[in-house]
Amino acid sequence: MTATILMIAMTLSTILAILSFWLPQMTPDMEKLSPYECGFDPLGSMRLPFSMRFFLIAILFLLFDLEIALLLPFPWAAQLNTPSIVILWAALILTLLTLGLIYEWLQGGLEWAE
């Protein structure tokens, strides 16, 4: 029974795949080949200039978002037999992120306009 259903499904999908190549009109013209973007002609550069400052701020946001993800399990981990290890790891993570933030601040990465 399942072999019959499998053969019917494979045959039907093969027929539909072959028909999808034969049915479309094969006469491309300029209108069909040009992209349509909300009624505007897509002339000019497709890429907009990207601010490097914005990229740095986005990376910093991701780092501090990762900090939240790393520190979230610590209240539950503090109930372990050795909470001093948990506090040590939390302090280490916060120290590294704080040093990184101070470094970015001193390098001028957080200043939006110069």
Curated annotation (Swiss-Prot):
Query: Which reaction is recorded as catalysed by this protein?
Result: a ubiquinone + NADH + 5 H(+)(in) = a ubiquinol + NAD(+) + 4 H(+)(out)
Q: Name one Pfam family in it.
A: Oxidored_q4
Record has RNA-binding as a keyword: no
Q: Where are the transmembrane segments?
A: 3-23, 54-74, 85-105
* Keyword terms: Electron transport, Membrane, Mitochondrion, NAD, Respiratory chain, Translocase, Transmembrane, Transmembrane helix, Transport, Ubiquinone
| UniProt-listed Enzyme Commission number(s) | 7.1.1.2
The way this protein sits in the membrane is described as: Multi-pass membrane protein
Offer an example of a GO molecular function term for this protein. NADH dehydrogenase (ubiquinone) activity
Cell compartments where the protein resides: Mitochondrion membrane
GO cellular component, as recorded: mitochondrial membrane; respiratory chain complex I
Determine if Protease is one of this entry's keywords.
no
Q: What does the sequence similarity comment in the record state about its family?
A: Belongs to the complex I subunit 3 family.
Q: What does this protein do?
A: Core subunit of the mitochondrial membrane respiratory chain NADH dehydrogenase (Complex I) that is believed to belong to the minimal assembly required for catalysis. Complex I functions in the transfer of electrons from NADH to the respiratory chain. The immediate electron acceptor for the enzyme is believed to be ubiquinone.
Q: Name the chain's protein.
A: NADH-ubiquinone oxidoreductase chain 3
Quote the gene name from the UniProt entry.
mt-nd3
